[in-house]
Amino acid sequence: RALATQLPVIPRSQVTFLAPVTRPEK
């Protein structure tokens, strides 16, 4: 899961956008 390593690298705005992608439960 290389994307998981890039999560903390990208800005918070992107994290919120990727949140539903990494956590489909929510």
Swiss-Prot record:
**Cofactor(s) demanded:** Ca(2+); Mg(2+)
Sorted keywords for this record are:
Calcium, Hydrolase, Magnesium, Metal-binding
Q: So what EC number does this one have?
A: 3.-.-.-
Membrane spanning segments where?
Answer: none
- Cell inner membrane in keyword set: no
First-level EC class: hydrolase
- Superkingdom, according to UniProt? Eukaryota
GO MF, one term, reads: metal ion binding
Keyword Hydrolase tagged? yes
What function does this protein fulfil? May have hydrolase activity.
Family classification = Belongs to the FAH family.
Q: Please state what the protein is called.
A: Fumarylacetoacetate hydrolase domain-containing protein 2A
